[in-house]
């Protein structure tokens, strides 16, 4: 075998290994982001605020927007938005919501796109919801669904939230259903005012299509 042929084959092998390493890293990144989202969902059940806040980057440009509670900009504002007014100390000493509070929000149907540099990513999920929350001073059994469009940043090899945007489709009393009562409002708490108004807050039956971060995977449009 000529040395030129050997060099060519070695180069092809090196290029192939590099491509496979990049593809493997993307697979690992997608799995890590899915784990981040699922962890967030579990922490929301009893509103474990320290765990929730720990999922975020400390950057100044982080943002949180949850339907009609407003838009929060900057780490300090985002962290404060997750602080529950009436803390309950759980059996393990953690700060949580009171025992009757229930907020099960399950991420599903995720579509994640990692940027070529592997440092940032975007993702979209449905959030299926069952809860026991106070609305109008009463504890209500609620059923709901919404959509997340989130942005993530990789810091020190760890994926964290950069922007979290959740648009409720329905949040309805279980005994009434979403056709009768599509949404029970949940305005921001007085002690946690947002940085600004919502940019997306459209519920059923508006027909609103929450903007996609990605193009059609077949047509590219």
Regions found by a protein language model. Give the residues of each.
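Short, low-complexity N-terminal intrinsically disordered segments enriched in polar/charged residues
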Residues: 1-42, 46, 50, 54-55
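Short beta-strand edge/turn micro-motifs at domain boundaries
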Residues: 5, 120-124, 145-178
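A solvent-exposed, acidic/Ser-Thr-rich amphipathic alpha-helical stretch
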Residues: 49-129
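Extracellular/periplasmic carbohydrate-active domains that bind, remodel
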Residues: 87-95, 126-136, 147, 183-185, ...
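Short aromatic-glycine motifs in intrinsically disordered, low-complexity regions
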Residues: 96-99, 136-141, 153
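Short, surface-exposed coil-to-beta transition loops
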Residues: 105-107, 142-148
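Short, cysteine-centered beta-strand-loop-beta hairpins and adjacent loop/turn segments enriched
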Residues: 130-142, 170-172
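A hydrophobic membrane-anchoring alpha-helix module
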Residues: 169-171, 178-221
């Amino acid at each position: 075998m000529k040395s030129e042929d050997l060099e060519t084959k070695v180069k092809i092998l090196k290029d192939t290994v590099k491509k496979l390493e990049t593809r493997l890293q993307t697979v690992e990144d997608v799995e890590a982001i899915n784990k981040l989202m699922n962890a967030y969902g579990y922490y929301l059940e009893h509103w474990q605020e320290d765990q929730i806040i720990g999922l975020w980057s400390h950057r100044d440009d982080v943002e949180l927007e949850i339907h009609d509670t407003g838009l929060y900009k900057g780490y300090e504002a985002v962290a404060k938005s997750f602080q529950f007014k009436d803390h309950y100390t759980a059996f393990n000493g953690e700060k949580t919501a009171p025992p009757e509070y229930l907020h099960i929000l399950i991420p599903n149907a995720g579509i994640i796109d990692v940027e070529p540099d592997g440092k940032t990513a975007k993702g979209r999920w449905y959030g299926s919801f069952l809860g026991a929350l106070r609305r109008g001073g009463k504890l209500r059994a609620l059923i709901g669904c919404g959509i997340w469009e989130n942005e993530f940043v990789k810091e020190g090899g760890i994926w964290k939230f950069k922007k979290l945007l959740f648009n409720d489709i329905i949040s309805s009393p279980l005994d009434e259903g979403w056709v009768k009562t599509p949404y029970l409002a949940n305005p921001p708490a007085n002690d946690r005012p947002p940085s600004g108004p919502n940019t997306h807050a459209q519920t059923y039956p508006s027909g609103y299509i929450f903007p996609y971060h990605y193009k059609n995977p077949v047509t590219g449009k």
